[in-house]
Amino acid sequence: MTQLSVNVNKIATLRNSRGGSLPSVLKLSELILDSGAHGITVHPRSDERHITKQDVFELQEFLRTYNEKITKLGISKKEYNIEGEPSERFLDLVLKAKPDQATLVPVKPGEITSDHGFQFADQKTFSTLKPIVEAIRKEGIRVSLFMETDFTFYDQVVALGAERIELYTGPFAHAFDLSEEKGKEIFTDYQRAAIEANKLGLAVNAGHDLDTNNLRVFAKLPYLKEVSIGHRLMAQSLVDGLETTVKSYLKVLSLGNETE
């Protein structure tokens, strides 16, 4: 089954909008995991507008103790995924927090959310990423790169030593919002990308604006290892509750190729 990692940035955004400690990122992360999610994702930006450095390390400690408890019961370990730009700031954070996975994402100044994958046509991209990826891998941390469906440069991901790609699903989700037919049309690009990535030995993650509607289609993606979902999951939880929402996402993912 495709793994679900829940991005908790929006919880931190709500907390920071008022100040103080409510809602609690830790308590709601625990509820998310207790509801069946396979991991927690954070994207700590340099301006700390949602997830802060303190959050990163508090979640690290929380997951350590949570995993100690559940593994004794025979339950599989929950993963910690930290996303961020390839910078010295982010590298330092990752090497100290030691997550299970570090997802490197290109960041533009002033952007509200990630909206594009790495472009290897620019040779600076490879040279910037190489030392970052090597330093993270040296610590035994899995590396994933945020990519689009153009698989021309997937061999560069392999050359860097990254083990996974995370497909940017914004274009698919936005097409699906217009109509399911349009979503299915663009979904073929993701199918080809996943197949080519697998041929190169890369595992495939995906994320951005996925929800229980468009996942009925996207969960069919070949070789889909993990989805990272935040904004739309949190939006749905305002209506249905967090536990119910997480379980509904897990149900759609579990159907996989059984969905139409």
UniProtKB/Swiss-Prot annotation:
3-amino-2-oxopropyl phosphate binds at residues 7, 18, 209, 230-231. InterPro entries: Aldolase_TIM, PyrdxlP_synth_PdxJ, Pyridoxine-5'_phos_synth. One of its GO terms (cellular component) is cytosol. Pathway: Cofactor biosynthesis; pyridoxine 5'-phosphate biosynthesis; pyridoxine 5'-phosphate from D-erythrose 4-phosphate: step 5/5. Its main location: cytoplasm. Catalyzes the complicated ring closure reaction between the two acyclic compounds 1-deoxy-D-xylulose-5-phosphate (DXP) and 3-amino-2-oxopropyl phosphate (1-amino-acetone-3-phosphate or AAP) to form pyridoxine 5'-phosphate (PNP) and inorganic phosphate. This is Pyridoxine 5'-phosphate synthase. The lineage of its organism: Bacteria, Pseudomonadati, Spirochaetota, Spirochaetia, Leptospirales.
